[in-house]
Design a protein with these regions (language model features):
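Compositionally biased terminal segments of proteins
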Residues: 1-184
Length: 184
């Protein structure tokens, strides 16, 4: 993590946001351990701004935690903790093989293993979403400096292949080419 260039107030805000997300995930895990005393383990895949915060890629406030995949048994707890599972509509913004690139969230848990999608998968999904805050998220040095551009090219092709109309496909390709030109 490169906090060197952040002023003290932004560092404090970042630490508070990161700690809030981590504490929520740890509490969810603790509650799941109370509900289920078996040896079963569960998973939750986090995406969006919260994933980028957990990966030390962005340093802004995010109001929600989004999950695109989770074990069915923990879904009532996710709902209780206001972890948004309604982003499954955006699952088409992720290549089919995104699970092959999952990154474990480095927190100690007993029952629930938390993951984020890869940085490349997050960039593709945010290029698909095409909102101003999404562009801001993926234009930080922490995101752009270590991207695997060959993988990015393939992921863009995979997502475009699954798009329903030519307009969305062309729009994504143009956004990606612009992004690539500015940050590669």
């Amino acid at each position: 993590m490169s906090l060197f260039f952040l002023d003290n107030s932004r560092i404090k805000l970042y630490n508070k946001i990161n700690n809030t997300i981590i504490e929520k995930l740890k509490q969810l895990d603790s509650d799941m351990a109370l509900i289920d005393s078996t040896d079963d383990l569960y998973t939750c895949v986090i995406v969006g701004g919260s994933a980028l915060v957990l990966m030390d890629k962005i340093f802004r406030s995010t109001h929600d935690i989004d999950s695109i995949a989770s074990s069915e048994k923990i879904q009532p707890l996710l709902e209780a903790y206001n972890i948004n599972m309604n982003v499954k509509a955006y699952l088409t913004n992720f290549p089919d093989d995104y699970r092959e690139r999952l990154v474990p969230v480095e927190i100690e848990t007993k029952k629930v293993k938390f993951y984020t999608v890869s940085t490349e998968d997050l960039v593709v999904s945010k290029l698909c979403a095409s909102r101003d805050k999404d562009f801001e998220d993926i234009e930080t040095k922490e995101v752009t400096e270590n991207l695997n551009w060959k993988l990015m090219d393939r992921l863009i092709e995979d997502v475009c292949y699954g798009m329903l109309n030519e307009y969305d496909e062309n729009h994504l390709r143009m956004r990606y080419e612009d992004y690539k030109e500015r940050f590669m």
